[in-house]
Amino acid sequence: DGVDVATILAEKASDEAITSVSGLIRGAAGTTVTLRIGRGDATPFDVMLTRAEIVIPSVEWRMLNDTVAYIRISEFKGNTPEILATGMRELATQQPQAYVLDVRGNPGGLLDSAQAVLGLFYAGTALWEERATGVQRELLTIAPSDAFAQPSVPVVVLVDGGTASASEVVTGALRDRYPRTTVVGTQSFGKGIVQNIYPLTNGGTVRLTIAQWLTPNKSAIHGVGIMPDIIVNDDANARATVPCVANRQPADGETLCRDPQLATALGLVN
């Protein structure tokens, strides 16, 4: 099969067009796809690719400068705490004076993964689960299986409207329980309920909400979200002043990126 990338994007270079191209390119591992690529006024050319499974790590880390460590969690998977522990041990050798934890666009994932991630920062209450009956149950952080030195330096958490569910649990818990936590960005999504799915005799299903999640200080998450301590919109017209993270790319001729939320975080901890 073939995908004329040049024609599709030339007709409408939009998010919808990019999604359309992506859908056409995807397929079973081992199969091939031919792409027609156009560059400027040059004659388009064909490239045949063999499809393969792409594994995107849920955690990435780096030093942004000599003193600030950056961690991005894109999703809370089963192995996320283990990978994060590896990253934090590696970063600790460089003695960071602050951490920036980026959960922008993180849709959530496994609750026990979030509890174990919190266990890398502190021991204690991770969240409360409030049943429909009003009964509240305390859920604790999950300690790492190996010896681990929890950090004691400031943490800035970056959030936006795509920060949801388990990532909101982590954000709220760090603000409530980890000293010197500051939340920067825009209001999070506000998804914090537990639902059971029951099958119906007609083949349908019904979702029944049985509980909601509360932060350690018993603040609701669902329908409310996490309101940042410092509200910073992602302004496309901002100056390019910070290292490029979270798949951001610099503009032509530049090496830094426009990311006012990260710039604010660095201003707080530098």
Locations of regions flagged by a protein language model:
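Cleft-lining beta-strand/loop regions that shape enzyme active-site pockets
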Residues: 4-9, 14-201
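A short, sequence-level motif marking secondary-structure junctions
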Residues: 49-55, 212-213, 228-229
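Metal-dependent DNA phosphodiester-chemistry modules and their immediately adjacent helices/loops
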Residues: 165, 216-221
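Glycine-rich beta-alpha junction loops
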Residues: 190-191, 212-214
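Short acidic, Pro/Gly- and aromatic-enriched capping/linker segments at domain boundaries
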Residues: 202-212
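Conserved functional hotspot residues or short segments at active or partner-binding sites
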Residues: 219-270
